[in-house]
């Protein structure tokens, strides 16, 4: 137990050494240690503030990026919608134009057919008239080959003329 209980002289010298050490540390080391601790504390606070600022900046950038993405998507959708509308318009215009051209071609074909038909009918009438004249001429020559037949024909024509 003697080892655990310090003596008064030892206790006195330990206290004196402690106070001298405390004085020397306060005089020479305490200010640099406190300055170093303060500097460290300040650098930690600055780092925390910088990290918080960077976090807020990241949030702002992220929200800006999301906004830009939304705008880009909206613009893309608008461009796609406009492209679809333009495609539909082009298809409709082409279809209408093709229909108009087809109707014109059909009308021209009908007109051409009608003209060809009228031309063929006129040609046929002319041909029939020529044939009729030839046949009539042959018949008249045959019938009027004698004098007696000529007198009969003249009398018949006079009779027909009186009736009409």
Curated annotation (Swiss-Prot):
Q: Which GO terms describe its cellular component?
A: plasma membrane; proton-transporting ATP synthase complex
The organism's place on the tree of life at top rank: Bacteria
Q: Which InterPro entries match?
A: ATP_synth_B-like_membr_sf, ATP_synth_b/b'su_bac/chlpt, ATP_synth_F0_bsu_bac, ATP_synthase_B_chain
* Main location (coarse class): membrane
Q: Name one Pfam family in it.
A: ATP-synt_B
Q: Which CDD domains match?
A: ATP-synt_Fo_b
Q: What keywords does the record list, in alphabetical order?
A: ATP synthesis, Cell membrane, CF(0), Hydrogen ion transport, Ion transport, Membrane, Transmembrane, Transmembrane helix, Transport
Entry annotated with the keyword Transport: yes
**Keyword ATP-binding: yes or no?**
no
Molecular function terms from GO: proton-transporting ATP synthase activity, rotational mechanism; proton-transporting ATPase activity, rotational mechanism
Report the subcellular localization. Answer: Cell membrane
Residues that span the membrane, as ranges: 8-28
Q: What does this protein do?
A: F(1)F(0) ATP synthase produces ATP from ADP in the presence of a proton or sodium gradient. F-type ATPases consist of two structural domains, F(1) containing the extramembraneous catalytic core and F(0) containing the membrane proton channel, linked together by a central stalk and a peripheral stalk. During catalysis, ATP synthesis in the catalytic domain of F(1) is coupled via a rotary mechanism of the central stalk subunits to proton translocation. Component of the F(0) channel, it forms part of the peripheral stalk, linking F(1) to F(0).
Q: Which family does it belong to?
A: Belongs to the ATPase B chain family.
The entry describes its oligomerization and partners as: F-type ATPases have 2 components, F(1) - the catalytic core - and F(0) - the membrane proton channel. F(1) has five subunits: alpha(3), beta(3), gamma(1), delta(1), epsilon(1). F(0) has three main subunits: a(1), b(2) and c(10-14). The alpha and beta chains form an alternating ring which encloses part of the gamma chain. F(1) is attached to F(0) by a central stalk formed by the gamma and epsilon chains, while a peripheral stalk is formed by the delta and b chains.
Q: What is this protein called?
A: ATP synthase subunit b
Gene behind this protein: atpF
